UniProtKB/Swiss-Prot annotation:
It is found in: Endoplasmic reticulum membrane. GO terms for cellular component: signal peptidase complex. This is Signal peptidase complex catalytic subunit SEC11. The gene is SEC11. One of its GO terms (molecular function) is serine-type endopeptidase activity. The active site is at S44, H83, D113. It comes from Komagataella phaffii (strain GS115 / ATCC 20864).
């Protein structure tokens, strides 16, 4: 394989990666969420959602309702949490802006999420903490992501296969 063919393959790989990145960012713009697709990592929402389910989020609604399943991030913790809204109330700021505050709980958990929230915080702020509301899901499809994340040999094997296929594919 000459240098020109190698450059073409490298450009094809760059095109695939940039297309995936543009798709992700475009989906984020449409859904108004930094993380429009997430994978369930625990059993806290069983039986509604199982470990490995892929969730599709929507974050364009001004408020969420009691009973909605939301994905939120806690300040200082990297992994988003998927739980159901248990309680909500609205607070008007000094500048007359209405903020929605939420209390959540996993369906399979005995207590609410108060202990998970940021230090000295009794509620989630809808605008600051919530990534989106779950609108659809695909069962079990996210297990591939979990396998790659939790198993370093699976990650190395997948990267090796990708590199090998790139080197062996001819145009």
């Amino acid at each position: 394989m000459n240098i020109r063919q190698q450059l073409v393959q490298l450009l094809n790989l760059a095109m695939v990666l940039s297309t995936a990145f543009m798709f992700w960012k475009g989906l984020g713009l449409v859904t108004n969420s930094n993380s429009p697709i997430v994978v369930v990592l625990s059993g806290s929402m069983e039986p509604a959602f199982q470990r490995g389910d892929i969730l599709f989020l929507w974050n364009r609604d001004k408020y969420v309702d009691i009973g909605d399943v939301v994905v939120y991030e806690v300040k200082g913790k990297p992994i988003p949490i998927v739980h159901r809204v248990l309680r909500e109330h609205k607070v008007t700021n000094k500048d007359r802006k209405v903020r929605q505050l939420l209390l959540t709980k996993g369906d399979n958990n005995p207590t609410d999420d108060l202990s998970l929230y940021a230090h000295k915080s009794n509620y989630l702020d809808r605008d600051e903490d919530v990534l989106g509301t779950v609108k659809a899901y695909l069962p079990k499809v996210g297990y591939v992501t979990i396998l790659i994340t939790e198993n370093k040999y699976a990650k190395l094997g997948l990267l090796g296969l990708m590199a090998l296929s790139t080197l062996l594919t001819r145009e």
